[in-house]
């Protein structure tokens, strides 16, 4: 029997893809010019629920699955997992020597949630968590969800002006932090914004610059004007406070906002993407299903997480995936440390490892890399920025991570929308960010016309589905510019889709270099330079040029002990890539400006290069 679902779906989406121009633009066109004619009926044999295919030779795809989305809160998910696996190890904080099983974790989370309510925080209040990876971070993440409080994930590297910006933006009522980490003096930084703190009654702060902030909580030291987290958890253990928590939970909805995740700031001021229980619970459920977690034993579910918890990869892909699927979450260090990640794998028999490309490069380059035991590790996740094919191959071959998957997502999409299957081939993993996730739609559109592109033709990637954020907190206009009435989230990423539905990210629309009218995608050149035997890493940016508009600048980091010249690099390019893609400038660098989550800040790199080149 012929299945016409794809044609009907495509017809609706083709209209939606036009964004602000609306459906009338499409409907008024002469029928001969409509790409709708190219969509043919799909036979039932062509409909694949596990690996859906693009429709009609165009870059639109919809993810299918036999499982339904769930309408549960984070707290309900933790309760269910604790009931199923009470004695299974849930959380191991190696640098704090903390180990909890799921029953113990649930008990502590309930007490913390109850304690937060007992000090006057209420459903919908915003509570910032500011600090490195720690037991307190996981506790606050889960406790706020249990209590209906909105967690605000604050970058642990923020200084006073950045901190003031995010706390004011979302109207934080409270903030939690350790006294210090390395050179970061959290209490002193907050005092720069709130000099009133030192003399304030704990829990009753009145700040001129942060009028919403009343409650400051210290994780590890009694400090003037603050409440101590241990005292709050202890108070939460009282039966009357736990009873109040249970009463409050009757009024929680899975559609309530649970978390404000600030974008990484690779292009300017961060925006507060607001995510609900429904967003996060379902994304973590589907990530775990794609990783085959429901089929694995406790010994096969030991997830090593060196990534920061303030970022979606850590808090959703790490903490929530573990809580949903009964995996053991192993935090290897307070901030990223390649050696500590290797120690966690070796000593704790880690089976999964998460990280960004930059983190994996550092792990592979540890001087004593070969001394670690990789017999337990099977796979993991690489995400956060484009991963060069050579790096994917090195991880799989050198670390025994045959089930490694490449993941693509954005904070605004909760975050994962494309992901490999563990059984995908090495070439499929090295050449793409995987396939569409279930219950998610994706399309690639021409940035100038708004029409769907043909397969294997670059355009801007749009996403639609349950995963799309509720909006940017307090910024309705920016929300509408990003998620229009058609409900498509415009990623700003340039991508292409192949016949099997694999997606490849070729760059950011803002990073695309226009040199003398030619469009050049940095990711293509960055992958190319990694074929040079002496190149460890490459980043390509466009720098200003009076004649061409922009010129190409390749910022190259060489392998340890290697040397070469700009002339040799250019000679390597000749005959292998188009002449107009050969960089005018080759600059050798020791590193790149990074966000705390490991993403390269191209706009800062561009500024540095223009200064260096005196442009």
Curated annotation (Swiss-Prot):
Localisation: Mitochondrion
Xref: PROSITE patterns: AMP_BINDING
Modified residues (N6-acetyllysine): 179, 182, 199, 340, 398, 510, 544, 570
Transit peptide limits: 1-41
Pfam families associated with the record: AMP-binding (PF00501), AMP-binding_C (PF13193)
InterPro entries found in the cross-reference section: AMP-bd_C, AMP-bd_C_sf, AMP-binding_CS, AMP-dep_synth/lig_dom, ANL_N_sf
Domain of life: Eukaryota
Transmembrane segment boundaries: none
N6-succinyllysine modified-residue sites: 182, 478, 544, 570, 599
Primary subcellular site in the record, as a coarse category: mitochondrion
UniProt xrefs under Gene3D superfamilies: 3.30.300.30, N-terminal domain of ligase-like
Entry binding sites for ATP: 263-271, 493, 508, 599
Its job: Acyl-CoA synthases catalyze the initial reaction in fatty acid metabolism, by forming a thioester with CoA. Has some preference toward medium-chain substrates. Plays a role in adipocyte differentiation.
Protein's recorded name: Medium-chain acyl-CoA ligase ACSF2, mitochondrial
